[in-house]
Regions:
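Alpha-helical linker/edge segments of TPR/alpha-solenoid repeat scaffolds
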Residues: 98-111, 174-201
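Short coil turns that delineate tetratricopeptide repeat
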Residues: 161-162
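TPR-adjacent "capping" and linker segments in tetratricopeptide-repeat scaffold/adaptor proteins
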Residues: 45, 108-134
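Divalent-metal (often Zn2+) His-rich catalytic cores of metallo-beta-lactamase-fold enzymes
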Residues: 7-69, 73-107, 173-174, 181
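Hydrophobic/aromatic side-chain positions at a characteristic register within alpha-helices
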Residues: 2, 61-62, 141
Length: 202
């Protein structure tokens, strides 16, 4: 999974590298970057983008917004746009939040205990009835809400792991998310994960 990043330390590291004015950079990923001006401009853009996301996240936290609200709201301005195939702004927001706040989000008492929501999914499925859950999941998919579709199909499948309708809706939601990822940010991790979920689907 994604580790919690250290934005302040990362910004300081970029400032140190910029001050060195290197002619060649050997990154951890991809090919070497050559040319002092190209390197300087690239690192300055990354530094300023990270600083922007950091500051916007802190401002949102101080305004009392939840991490999920900020993940939806915070976007890079046009002058700081970056390719997000290795990282994503919304994931960076979550990482910055946890860097300062830790794992407890102050949203639900249940976060304090080792009993996840999934432990009651089968009971929810029994009470709600799989027919109703399938209808709700399908409505979310029609409305263009594949993540909500996945939430509901997870509940349905907890009650009936082999339910063909729930499995089909889950796969349709995964395909829609994969298409969005491939036609949008093209984030490698997101694409690999979605493909792996489709490959391992029963």
């Amino acid at each position: 999974g994604e580790k919690v990043r250290k934005p302040v330390e990362y910004i300081k590291s970029l400032d140190r590298l910029i001050a060195l004015n290197p002619d060649v950079i050997l990154p951890s990923h991809l090919d070497p970057t050559i040319g002092a001006e190209k390197i300087r401009k690239g690192m300055q853009r990354i530094r300023d983008a990270v600083q922007y996301v950091h500051d916007e996240t802190i401002a949102g936290m101080n305004a009392g917004k939840t991490v999920n609200q900020l993940m939806k709201e915070i976007k890079l301005p046009p002058n700081l746009e970056l390719v997000q195939n290795h990282g994503r702004v919304d994931w960076a927001v979550k990482s910055i939040w946890e860097y300062y706040m830790g794992w407890f989000r102050f949203e639900s008492t249940t976060e304090l205990y080792p009993i996840p929501a999934q432990d009651v999914y089968a009971d929810l499925a029994q009470i709600a009835g799989n027919e109703n859950l399938i209808a709700l999941a399908n409505n979310y998919l029609i409305q263009g809400e594949p993540v909500k579709t996945l939430h509901i199909t997870e509940i349905a499948l907890a009650g009936d792991p082999q339910n063909a309708s729930a499995l089909a809706l889950r796969d349709q939601a995964l395909v829609e998310l994969l298409e969005r990822a491939e036609n949008g940010l093209r984030n490698d991790y997101e694409i690999y994960w979605l493909k792996s979920q489709l490959d391992t689907a029963p």
